[in-house]
């Protein structure tokens, strides 16, 4: 909204023209979200401790996690607040793509909040009933998917970009809605599954958001889009502001979530962040790229699917415990080692994903 204000003030002082530059707004969006998150952290943690809103640890989990019982959770509230304020300050309010991401972010945040509330206040370790969680995730995803289809059905915004092939971009039509639905819901749940160790989910989220921010900048620039042979999407540039806000809020949260964590993000954070990343990828037509960049999330999800499938079909487990980060814990890896190695893998995958934009 400051952009609109600056447009009115620029006639009085030309210096306000800096607010029209995307790179400037991206940087200050990151810093704004970072500082808000750092400011909120101690206050939110103190408030959660006062209300005794602490993590509920399952009895069948790794023994090393029993010491985490009672650690404040629902810290995702600081992430969502930081992102929302920063985006509203620095993005163009007229951009429909920005509102699509915010709708998913806040909608999934509410679903996650209800889930966390049932866990930590009602002391129900199962949280929100799975079918109801999936129902509301589906409703939100379908509303946004249909909205995005209506916005972009007559533009390249409904094409499917295939890595390594610059001339293969099929027009999806109504299938765009179905694909968008699965990407948004799937990414949301994948990040949620990854959020099992201190800082494990937030850094891959930061890396992927940073990578998607670069893609958004290229997609919204007609010259770079043509150079990289990706669809030029007029509204996509403003998603850079959303991505940098996620990066800033994520780094601010990591300040308090790094091992040993002072606060956990809870489902209010993980479901919302995953949904936001999925929505951004769909808007940029980079669903395949998200699979590469978010490979850690994919790996965690596949480990659960394989574990459950193997146990039901053969009566045997593939891993000592799923998601796979627990498998390495039970193998004797210290928690910080698991976390940092997964971070390194995530960074490598984001760089590989960015490289695929040119390798065509």
From Swiss-Prot:
Keywords attached to this entry: Cell cycle, Cell division, Cell inner membrane, Cell membrane, Cell shape, Cell wall biogenesis/degradation, Magnesium, Membrane, Metal-binding, Peptidoglycan synthesis, Transferase, Transmembrane, Transmembrane helix
Cell division as UniProt keyword: yes
Biological role stated in the UniProt entry: Catalyzes the initial step of the lipid cycle reactions in the biosynthesis of the cell wall peptidoglycan: transfers peptidoglycan precursor phospho-MurNAc-pentapeptide from UDP-MurNAc-pentapeptide onto the lipid carrier undecaprenyl phosphate, yielding undecaprenyl-pyrophosphoryl-MurNAc-pentapeptide, known as lipid I.
Similarity annotation: Belongs to the glycosyltransferase 4 family. MraY subfamily.
One annotated Gene Ontology cellular component of this protein: plasma membrane
Molecular function via GO: metal ion binding; phospho-N-acetylmuramoyl-pentapeptide-transferase activity; UDP-N-acetylmuramoyl-L-alanyl-D-glutamyl-meso-2,6-diaminopimelyl-D-alanyl-D-alanine:undecaprenyl-phosphate transferase activity
Record-linked NCBIfam families: mraY
Keyword Transferase carried by entry: yes
HAMAP family, A to Z: MraY
Pfam families reported in the protein's UniProt record: Glycos_transf_4, MraY_sig1
Cofactors named for this entry: Mg(2+)
Main location: membrane
Pathway assignment: Cell wall biogenesis; peptidoglycan biosynthesis
Transmembrane segments: 27-47, 72-92, 94-114, 132-152, 168-188, 199-219, 236-256, 263-283, 288-308, 338-358
E.C. no: 2.7.8.13
Biological processes per GO annotation: cell division; cell wall organization; peptidoglycan biosynthetic process; regulation of cell shape
Enzyme kind, highest EC tier: transferase
Superkingdom assignment: Bacteria
Name the UniProt record assigns to this protein: Phospho-N-acetylmuramoyl-pentapeptide-transferase
Membrane topology: Multi-pass membrane protein
Catalytic reactions of this protein: UDP-N-acetyl-alpha-D-muramoyl-L-alanyl-gamma-D-glutamyl-meso-2,6-diaminopimeloyl-D-alanyl-D-alanine + di-trans,octa-cis-undecaprenyl phosphate = di-trans,octa-cis-undecaprenyl diphospho-N-acetyl-alpha-D-muramoyl-L-alanyl-D-glutamyl-meso-2,6-diaminopimeloyl-D-alanyl-D-alanine + UMP
Localization: Cell inner membrane
